Protein backbone atom coordinates (compact mmCIF):
# COMPACT_ATOMS: atom_id res chain seq x y z
CA UNK A 1 0.00 0.00 0.00
CA UNK A 2 1.34 3.43 -0.97
CA UNK A 3 0.79 5.44 2.22
CA UNK A 4 2.01 8.87 3.25
CA UNK A 5 5.15 7.49 4.88
CA UNK A 6 6.07 5.59 1.70
CA UNK A 7 5.43 8.71 -0.38
CA UNK A 8 7.67 10.79 1.84
CA UNK A 9 10.44 8.18 1.67
CA UNK A 10 10.18 8.16 -2.13
CA UNK A 11 10.45 11.95 -2.16
CA UNK A 12 13.56 11.60 0.00
CA UNK A 13 15.11 9.11 -2.44
CA UNK A 14 14.51 11.25 -5.52
CA UNK A 15 15.48 14.55 -3.92
CA UNK A 16 18.38 16.43 -5.54
CA UNK A 17 19.67 16.83 -1.97
CA UNK A 18 20.34 13.08 -1.67
CA UNK A 19 24.10 13.03 -1.01
CA UNK A 20 25.23 10.72 -3.82
CA UNK A 21 26.75 13.22 -6.24
CA UNK A 22 24.60 12.52 -9.31
CA UNK A 23 24.86 16.20 -10.27
CA UNK A 24 28.56 15.70 -11.08
CA UNK A 25 27.90 13.52 -14.16
CA UNK A 26 26.40 14.23 -17.58
CA UNK A 27 26.41 10.70 -19.11
CA UNK A 28 27.97 11.85 -22.36
CA UNK A 29 25.73 14.88 -22.68
CA UNK A 30 28.65 17.29 -22.20
CA UNK A 31 30.55 15.95 -25.20
CA UNK A 32 27.38 15.78 -27.30
CA UNK A 33 26.99 19.52 -26.76
CA UNK A 34 30.70 20.37 -27.02
CA UNK A 35 31.03 18.29 -30.19
CA UNK A 36 28.20 20.16 -31.86
CA UNK A 37 25.79 17.22 -31.90
CA UNK A 38 23.27 19.13 -29.77
CA UNK A 39 22.81 22.85 -30.29
CA UNK A 40 19.28 23.72 -29.27
CA UNK A 41 16.72 23.03 -26.59
CA UNK A 42 14.91 20.75 -29.06
CA UNK A 43 18.12 18.80 -29.73
CA UNK A 44 18.70 18.23 -26.01
CA UNK A 45 15.09 17.24 -25.44
CA UNK A 46 15.23 14.68 -28.25
CA UNK A 47 18.54 13.27 -26.95
CA UNK A 48 17.22 12.82 -23.40
CA UNK A 49 13.97 11.29 -24.68
CA UNK A 50 15.91 8.84 -26.84
CA UNK A 51 18.20 7.77 -24.01
CA UNK A 52 15.25 7.26 -21.68
CA UNK A 53 13.32 5.17 -24.21
CA UNK A 54 16.15 3.11 -25.63
CA UNK A 55 18.63 2.78 -22.77
CA UNK A 56 17.15 3.57 -19.35
CA UNK A 57 13.89 1.73 -20.09
CA UNK A 58 15.70 -1.26 -21.59
CA UNK A 59 18.44 -1.77 -19.01
CA UNK A 60 18.40 0.17 -15.74
CA UNK A 61 14.66 0.19 -15.15
CA UNK A 62 13.84 -3.47 -15.94
CA UNK A 63 16.88 -4.59 -13.94
CA UNK A 64 15.71 -2.42 -11.04
CA UNK A 65 12.39 -4.28 -11.15
CA UNK A 66 14.20 -7.61 -10.92
CA UNK A 67 16.47 -6.48 -8.11
CA UNK A 68 13.50 -5.09 -6.18
CA UNK A 69 11.78 -8.47 -6.34
CA UNK A 70 14.99 -10.25 -5.33
CA UNK A 71 15.37 -8.01 -2.27
CA UNK A 72 11.74 -8.67 -1.38
CA UNK A 73 12.35 -12.41 -1.52
CA UNK A 74 15.64 -12.20 0.36
CA UNK A 75 17.43 -13.74 -2.62
CA UNK A 76 20.88 -12.20 -2.33
CA UNK A 77 22.31 -14.33 -5.13
CA UNK A 78 19.75 -12.92 -7.56
CA UNK A 79 20.48 -9.42 -6.29
CA UNK A 80 24.18 -9.97 -7.00
CA UNK A 81 23.45 -11.53 -10.40
CA UNK A 82 21.40 -8.59 -11.62
CA UNK A 83 23.79 -6.10 -10.04
CA UNK A 84 26.61 -7.68 -12.05
CA UNK A 85 24.42 -7.69 -15.17
CA UNK A 86 23.72 -3.99 -14.79
CA UNK A 87 27.37 -3.06 -14.24
CA UNK A 88 28.39 -5.20 -17.22
CA UNK A 89 26.01 -3.16 -19.37
CA UNK A 90 28.03 0.03 -18.89
CA UNK A 91 29.67 0.58 -22.26
CA UNK A 92 32.45 2.92 -21.18
CA UNK A 93 34.77 3.26 -18.22
CA UNK A 94 33.17 6.62 -17.46
CA UNK A 95 29.64 5.21 -17.23
CA UNK A 96 30.82 2.34 -15.03
CA UNK A 97 32.73 4.73 -12.78
CA UNK A 98 29.64 6.90 -12.40
CA UNK A 99 27.48 3.95 -11.40
CA UNK A 100 30.13 2.69 -8.99
CA UNK A 101 30.55 6.09 -7.34
CA UNK A 102 26.81 6.67 -6.98
CA UNK A 103 26.36 3.14 -5.67
CA UNK A 104 29.14 3.53 -3.10
CA UNK A 105 27.73 6.86 -1.94
CA UNK A 106 24.22 5.43 -1.56
CA UNK A 107 25.64 2.36 0.20
CA UNK A 108 27.42 4.59 2.70
CA UNK A 109 24.22 6.53 3.32
CA UNK A 110 22.00 3.47 3.77
CA UNK A 111 24.51 1.87 6.14
CA UNK A 112 24.52 5.07 8.21
CA UNK A 113 20.71 4.90 8.25
CA UNK A 114 21.00 1.31 9.54
CA UNK A 115 19.07 -0.20 6.64
CA UNK A 116 19.54 -4.00 6.72
CA UNK A 117 21.54 -5.67 3.91
CA UNK A 118 22.98 -2.37 2.64
CA UNK A 119 26.47 -3.85 2.89
CA UNK A 120 25.62 -7.17 1.21
CA UNK A 121 26.82 -6.19 -2.28
CA UNK A 122 30.50 -5.31 -2.55
CA UNK A 123 30.24 -3.11 -5.66
CA UNK A 124 26.61 -2.04 -5.85
CA UNK A 125 25.11 -0.25 -8.81
CA UNK A 126 23.02 2.76 -7.84
CA UNK A 127 19.80 1.00 -8.90
CA UNK A 128 20.61 -1.98 -6.66
CA UNK A 129 20.54 0.07 -3.47
CA UNK A 130 17.77 2.35 -4.74
CA UNK A 131 15.69 -0.83 -4.97
CA UNK A 132 16.76 -1.93 -1.48
CA UNK A 133 15.71 1.40 0.01
CA UNK A 134 12.37 1.12 -1.78
CA UNK A 135 11.75 -2.35 -0.37
CA UNK A 136 12.82 -1.33 3.14
CA UNK A 137 10.55 1.72 3.12
CA UNK A 138 7.69 -0.18 1.48
CA UNK A 139 7.54 1.97 -1.62
CA UNK A 140 5.62 -0.02 -4.27
CA UNK A 141 7.73 -0.88 -7.30
CA UNK A 142 5.42 1.03 -9.66
CA UNK A 143 6.01 4.29 -7.80
CA UNK A 144 9.68 3.56 -7.14
CA UNK A 145 10.29 3.02 -10.85
CA UNK A 146 8.62 6.32 -11.72
CA UNK A 147 10.75 8.04 -9.10
CA UNK A 148 13.91 6.48 -10.52
CA UNK A 149 13.07 7.72 -14.02
CA UNK A 150 12.10 11.14 -12.68
CA UNK A 151 15.37 11.72 -10.82
CA UNK A 152 17.36 10.61 -13.88
CA UNK A 153 15.40 13.03 -16.09
CA UNK A 154 15.85 15.87 -13.63
CA UNK A 155 19.61 15.27 -13.43
CA UNK A 156 19.96 15.21 -17.21
CA UNK A 157 18.08 18.48 -17.65
CA UNK A 158 20.05 20.07 -14.81
CA UNK A 159 23.26 19.10 -16.62
CA UNK A 160 21.91 20.55 -19.86
CA UNK A 161 21.27 23.95 -18.26
CA UNK A 162 25.02 24.23 -17.64
CA UNK A 163 25.89 23.30 -21.22
CA UNK A 164 23.23 24.68 -23.55
CA UNK A 165 22.16 28.34 -23.64
CA UNK A 166 18.76 28.00 -22.06
CA UNK A 167 17.69 29.15 -18.63
CA UNK A 168 15.89 27.68 -15.67
CA UNK A 169 12.41 28.41 -17.02
CA UNK A 170 13.19 26.67 -20.30
CA UNK A 171 14.66 23.77 -18.33
CA UNK A 172 11.39 23.38 -16.45
CA UNK A 173 9.53 23.37 -19.76
CA UNK A 174 11.80 20.56 -21.00
CA UNK A 175 11.16 18.52 -17.85
CA UNK A 176 7.40 18.95 -18.17
CA UNK A 177 7.52 18.15 -21.89
CA UNK A 178 9.43 14.91 -21.21
CA UNK A 179 7.48 13.90 -18.11
CA UNK A 180 4.87 11.97 -20.19
CA UNK A 181 7.70 9.74 -21.45
CA UNK A 182 8.12 8.25 -17.97
CA UNK A 183 4.92 6.19 -18.02
CA UNK A 184 5.68 4.30 -21.27
CA UNK A 185 9.27 3.76 -20.10
CA UNK A 186 7.91 2.14 -16.93
CA UNK A 187 5.50 0.00 -18.93
CA UNK A 188 8.34 -1.23 -21.12
CA UNK A 189 10.46 -2.03 -18.05
CA UNK A 190 7.74 -4.32 -16.70
CA UNK A 191 7.11 -6.30 -19.89
CA UNK A 192 10.64 -6.93 -21.18
CA UNK A 193 11.89 -10.50 -20.80
CA UNK A 194 15.34 -11.35 -19.49
CA UNK A 195 16.77 -12.01 -22.95
CA UNK A 196 15.47 -8.65 -24.21
CA UNK A 197 17.45 -6.54 -21.76
CA UNK A 198 20.56 -4.52 -22.42
CA UNK A 199 19.93 -2.50 -25.58
CA UNK A 200 22.80 -0.14 -26.30
CA UNK A 201 23.03 3.29 -27.87
CA UNK A 202 26.23 3.63 -29.94
CA UNK A 203 26.08 7.44 -30.00
CA UNK A 204 25.76 7.56 -26.21
CA UNK A 205 28.73 5.21 -25.82
CA UNK A 206 30.81 7.27 -28.27
CA UNK A 207 29.90 10.53 -26.52
CA UNK A 208 30.83 9.07 -23.15
CA UNK A 209 34.12 7.65 -24.46
CA UNK A 210 35.07 10.95 -26.06
CA UNK A 211 34.11 12.81 -22.89
CA UNK A 212 36.70 10.73 -21.03
CA UNK A 213 39.41 12.52 -23.07
CA UNK A 214 37.70 15.85 -23.54
CA UNK A 215 40.22 18.65 -22.94
CA UNK A 216 38.03 20.83 -20.73
CA UNK A 217 35.10 19.45 -18.74
CA UNK A 218 32.48 20.67 -16.30
CA UNK A 219 31.41 17.14 -15.38
CA UNK A 220 33.35 14.23 -13.93
CA UNK A 221 34.86 11.48 -16.01
From Swiss-Prot:
Keyword Chaperone: yes
Keyword Nucleus: no
Pfam families: UreF (PF01730)
Domain of life: Bacteria
Subcellular location: Cytoplasm
UniProt GO MF annotations: nickel cation binding
Major location category of this protein: cytoplasm
Species of origin: Saccharophagus degradans (strain 2-40 / ATCC 43961 / DSM 17024)
Family statement drawn from the similarity comment of this UniProt entry: Belongs to the UreF family.
Subunit structure: UreD, UreF and UreG form a complex that acts as a GTP-hydrolysis-dependent molecular chaperone, activating the urease apoprotein by helping to assemble the nickel containing metallocenter of UreC. The UreE protein probably delivers the nickel.
Keywords for the protein's UniProt record, in alphabetical order: Chaperone, Cytoplasm, Nickel insertion
InterPro entries named in the record: UreF, UreF_sf
GO cellular component: cytoplasm
Function, as annotated: Required for maturation of urease via the functional incorporation of the urease nickel metallocenter.
The name this protein goes by in its record: Urease accessory protein UreF
Amino acid sequence: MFNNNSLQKLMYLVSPALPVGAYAYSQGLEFAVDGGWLKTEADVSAWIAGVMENSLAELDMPVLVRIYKAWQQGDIEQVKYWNHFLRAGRETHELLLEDDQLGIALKRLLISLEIPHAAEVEKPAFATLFALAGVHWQVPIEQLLQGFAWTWLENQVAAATKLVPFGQTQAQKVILALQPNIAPACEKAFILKDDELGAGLPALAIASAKHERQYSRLFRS
